[in-house]
Amino acid sequence: GMHGMISQVEGLAKALDLEFIHEKIELNSFWKLFPPRLTPIQDFVFKNKINNKFDIVISCGRKSIIPSIYLKKKFKSKIINIHIQEPKVSLDNFDFVVAPEHDGLKGSNVLTSKGAVHYLTNSELDENENYLKSRISTEKKIVTLILGGPNRYYDYNNQVIDLSLIHISEPTRRS
């Protein structure tokens, strides 16, 4: 969902050590219904005007593809545009595309990641390494599982989570 995409954009901006602002650029209601490959790259498709000038645009997900391409076409080499996730439009629309390795996306401007990009840094992890030490036993191995929330493809209700945990724990029980 929206938070996951913002998290990925922030993560990449932090990794690049960029100062950033969030600019929410929405397509108007009519153009939200169309896939990016069928949406015109024109300012009339936007609900709001784009007033800021940017050096780097980092977009993530389907709804941000058109604004990113629009800004790149408008400002050409004055900006760098980076899209996170498989855009399902020509990769030539972007300076860089960051996609998880499992998507199998190939191109001269494609950078692959192991899983999703996130905003946690090594220094933040190091600073907080003792956070859970008083709450967990050090005598046994700890496995951490981070589950995402519901989206239009998956419904993470309690039953699905319970079944997932049972499925994951079965190999452990056998050993």
Regions found by a protein language model. Give the residues of each.
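Short beta-strand elements of ligand-binding domains
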Residues: 60, 81-86, 98-100
